[in-house]
C-alpha cells in the first residue's frame, strides 16, 4: 500500500501518532523535499522516526514516480509531505498513478498553511482563492494572479499568497548544456513579495487602471507558522516591504475590503510596533 503522510508544519514531533506508526512499519519511506520545508533537517526526522528517509526531489516525483511506487502492491511504502499531503497537485498525480497500477493508497492528514493561517486571527471562511507569487526574472514578470486578488477583495475576501520556493533548480545555461549543476535554495520573503506587489500596483496605475490594492492596504506577514519561533506581523503593504520576519518559510495575506471587529482586534496583537521605523497603527488604517 502507498501511504501519503502529512508531517505538519513545525518539527519532527508534529507527525500524528497514526502517521508515525505507519512510518515505522513501512519498507521504504520517502521525504518529499521541494513543495515545502520543515524547520528541522532530514537527520532530525530520521532520529525521531527511527527510520532512514529517501529524499524525493521534484524530478523524481514528477518524472520517475514509478520508482516510488515500485513494489507498493506487495509492501508498504510511505511518502512524507510537509503540511498536508494534498497541499500540492503533484501528490494527487501520485495517487492517480498508483490507482492505475492497482496499488491501494491511504492518506493520513495533518495541519497545513491553508488552515493554520487562522493563527493570525482572520476567519478562515472569509478567505477567497489562494494565489502563488513567484520570483521574477529579467524576462518573466507575471502579474495575472493579481486578477484573483482583485476578485477576492471585491467580494470582501482575504487572499492567502503562497511564496515561491526554489529547491534544486538549474540555471538556464546549465539546463541547456545538460549539466547537473543546481542553484542554491531560495525562499521568497514577505519583503520580496510585497515589493513585487507594489510594482504591479504602479504598473496598473501607469496603464490607467484602478488597482485593487494600494500601498496602504492592510496585510499580514507570517513566518514559520507552526514552529516555536513563528512570527506574525500586521501592517500596510508598504510596511511589509521592510518588516523583519526572519528565516523562511514566509506567507503573505492581503486582507479583504471588509474586516470583522474581532478580526481587527486579533490583528492588533500583531501590529508592527509604533516605535518601528516603518510603523503605522492598525487602528489608523
Swiss-Prot record:
CDD domains linked: DHP5_DphB
Phosphoserine PTM positions: 171
Gene Ontology molecular functions: diphthine methyl ester synthase activity
EC number: 2.1.1.314
Pfam families reported for this sequence: TP_methylase
Pathway connected to this protein: Protein modification; peptidyl-diphthamide biosynthesis
InterPro entries referenced in this protein's UniProt entry, alphabetically: 4pyrrol_Mease, 4pyrrol_Methylase_sf, 4pyrrole_Mease_sub1, 4pyrrole_Mease_sub2, Dphthn_synthase
Enzyme superclass (EC): transferase
This protein's name: Diphthine methyl ester synthase
Organism: Homo sapiens
